[in-house]
C-alpha cells in the first residue's frame, strides 16, 4: 500500500493562508467608513405602568 505524500502540504497550507489574508485585506480595504461618525442621542420614553400610578399593599402587617 503506497504512503501518502505529505511533502507539499506545508507549501499548500502556507499559500492558502497567504491567499486568505490577501483576500480579506482586499475585502476590508473596499469597505467605506464614515469619516466623522456622529452620536445620535436616544430618547427613552417612560411608560406609565399601573404600579407607578397607585401604591398597593403587597403584604400584611405583622401582628
Curated annotation (Swiss-Prot):
GO terms for cellular component: mitochondrial membrane; proton-transporting ATP synthase complex. InterPro entries: ATP8_mammal (IPR039017), ATP8_metazoa (IPR001421). GO terms for biological process: proton motive force-driven ATP synthesis. The modification N6-acetyllysine is found at residue 57. One of its GO terms (molecular function) is proton transmembrane transporter activity. Keywords: Acetylation, ATP synthesis, CF(0), Hydrogen ion transport, Ion transport, Membrane, Mitochondrion, Transmembrane, Transmembrane helix, Transport. Pfam families: ATP-synt_8. The chain crosses the membrane at residues 8-24. It is found in: Mitochondrion membrane. Component of the ATP synthase complex composed at least of ATP5F1A/subunit alpha, ATP5F1B/subunit beta, ATP5MC1/subunit c (homooctomer), MT-ATP6/subunit a, MT-ATP8/subunit 8, ATP5ME/subunit e, ATP5MF/subunit f, ATP5MG/subunit g, ATP5MK/subunit k, ATP5MJ/subunit j, ATP5F1C/subunit gamma, ATP5F1D/subunit delta, ATP5F1E/subunit epsilon, ATP5PF/subunit F6, ATP5PB/subunit b, ATP5PD/subunit d, ATP5PO/subunit OSCP. This is ATP synthase F(0) complex subunit 8.
